[in-house]
Amino acid sequence: NAPLTWVLPAVEEVVMGNPNTTPTLIYEGLRYPQALLGDHQRVNSACAIATLQVLQDQGWKISDEAIVQGLSQVRWPGRLQKGQWQGHELLIDGAHNTDAARSLRAFIDRTYPDEPITWLMGLLETKDHQGVLRTVLRQGDHLHLIPLPGHVSADPEALAAIAQTID
């Protein structure tokens, strides 16, 4: 007898003109800036709103303004985090499984279509190395493998052997 809420992704409001503006999302009448990058965040933010609306229905005092403010200020370091280093654009992402790698690759394909990507990557020993590498790597990409300090890291040479089998 548990209630079920089916959540559809938030809709991106398309604004013609400056492509560098932060996208605005709309879900259940709430308009809010997409603070986290990636199309998958349309689903994640909609789930957060749906959860908060259930709490509102149960009497919690959470205003729509507070929801919008919270969504506009959310940060997730290491998840599609843009930066600069010595004049080079960086994208830092801790994609640690195939689903996260799929979201990362979708963002890369949308943001940098047809551009070769230089990857600096390390993986934990316990992760699906072949699944992650097969998901993110494309023909023409460059891969630099490193151990992850302070963790049980996969051997970079073993990862390189896997990467060499990917078409």
Model-identified regions with their sequence ranges:
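Internal gly/pro-rich beta-alpha loop/helix module
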Residues: 1-43
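Conserved beta-strand termini and adjacent loop/short-helix elements that scaffold enzyme active sites
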Residues: 7-9, 83, 146
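Residue-level detector of flexible, active-site-proximal loop/helix-junction positions
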Residues: 4, 11-13, 78, 87, ...
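Nucleotide phosphate-binding/pyrophosphate-handling subdomain across enzymes
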Residues: 28-142
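C-terminal helical cap/extension that packs against the catalytic core
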Residues: 1, 15-24, 89-91, 98, ...
